[in-house]
């Protein structure tokens, strides 16, 4: 059972590796057009062969991934219930479990903060400051966090964390391909991403969407849901989160604001926080109905949401 879960994660990583190497091969093909040496045709043939081989490798991994669900569907459900969603401290066996657990315990707040970042510059600065986070343990934590968030019906937050999980996987894969320490080459990844280099962003967004689709698909399988079931769940109740649970999860300064119901103090606190973190807490407070000093009529409710959003920017 555990090996099936490991094979699924291996499929995710191998798919990213194949896409990245394919983009590198295509980049080489484009570069050859700028040179005019006697060996151009030979180099072009080798690069084209490499591109074809990588495309075939990616196709094979896609087939293996689909077979995981058809060969043993009931086992898949057991594996994801036990190994990904329900047990918060169950980590992949690619590294020493004790080492992974200790790493998470020491750095969980930083890992969560990185998972909430949305801009390339913010992620690069954060990793430059906390370069010890550039490792497999971080990638594993973010991947498993995505499955847990989707299981908790927190799809928007899952998609945010998925972006950062794929960022970390691409950095690690670039390091493996170039045989460098990932802490020494992560800036190169962000340079390519921010420059919008042709091919690389397409690969990134393709893999990101594929990963999010896999998370949703396997979560539906593990809970026995069907796509039709999820349509009815897209209309949440007026208060879809437990107010007590949300309140306990807030930073102390936000708890004070909620208790005082003072909009000016709240605005000052939010302006001093990381924008992504502030947005996360604001959405949860609204969904839990913790902000009550503005009457919630149908007209006022939309203006209240707009006021919260204005404070985030």
Swiss-Prot record:
GO cellular component, one term: cytoplasm
GO biological process terms, semicolon-separated: protein folding; protein stabilization
SUPFAM superfamilies xref list: Hsp90 co-chaperone CDC37
Main location: cytoplasm
Localisation: Cytoplasm
Keyword terms of this UniProt record: Chaperone, Cytoplasm
Key word GTP-binding present: no
Single annotated GO MF: protein-folding chaperone binding
Family membership: Belongs to the CDC37 family.
Job of this protein: Co-chaperone that binds to numerous proteins and promotes their interaction with Hsp70 and Hsp90.
Subunit text: Forms complexes with Hsp70 and Hsp90.
Annotated PANTHER family: CDC37-RELATED (PTHR12800), HSP90 CO-CHAPERONE CDC37-LIKE 1 (PTHR12800:SF2)
This protein's name: Hsp90 co-chaperone Cdc37-like 1
Native source organism of the sequence: Danio rerio
Gene, per the UniProt record: cdc37l1
């Amino acid at each position: 059972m555990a090996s099936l879960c490991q094979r699924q994660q291996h499929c995710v990583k191998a798919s990213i590796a194949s896409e990245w190497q394919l983009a590198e091969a295509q980049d080489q093909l484009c570069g050859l057009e700028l040179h005019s040496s006697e060996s151009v045709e030979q180099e072009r043939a080798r690069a084209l062969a490499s591109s074809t081989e990588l495309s075939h490798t990616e196709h094979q991994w896609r087939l293996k991934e689909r077979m995981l669900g058809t060969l043993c569907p009931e086992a898949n459900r057991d594996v994801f219930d036990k190994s990904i969603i329900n047990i918060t401290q169950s980590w992949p066996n690619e590294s020493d479990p004790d080492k992974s657990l200790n790493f998470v315990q020491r750095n969980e707040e930083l890992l969560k903060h990185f998972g909430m970042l949305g801009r390339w510059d913010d992620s690069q600065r954060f990793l430059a400051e906390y370069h010890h986070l550039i490792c497999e343990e971080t990638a594993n934590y973010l991947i498993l966090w995505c499955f847990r968030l989707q299981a908790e019906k927190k799809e928007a937050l899952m998609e945010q964390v998925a972006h950062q999980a794929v960022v970390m996987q691409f950095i690690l894969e670039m390091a493996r391909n170039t045989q460098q320490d990932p802490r020494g080459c992560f800036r190169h990844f962000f340079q390519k991403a921010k420059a919008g280099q042709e091919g690389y962003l397409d690969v990134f967004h393709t893999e990101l969407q594929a990963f999010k689709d896999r998370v949703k698909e396997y979560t539906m399988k593990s809970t026995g849901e069907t796509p039709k079931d999820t349509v009815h769940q897209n209309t949440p109740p007026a208060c879809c989160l437990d107010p007590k649970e949300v309140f306990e999860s807030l930073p102390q300064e936000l708890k004070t604001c909620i208790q005082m119901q003072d909009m000016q103090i709240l605005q000052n606190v939010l302006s001093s926080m990381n924008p992504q973190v502030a947005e996360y807490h604001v959405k949860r407070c609204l969904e839990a109905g913790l902000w009550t000093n503005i009457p919630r009529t149908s007209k006022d409710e939309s203006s209240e949401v707009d006021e919260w959003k204005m404070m985030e920017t």
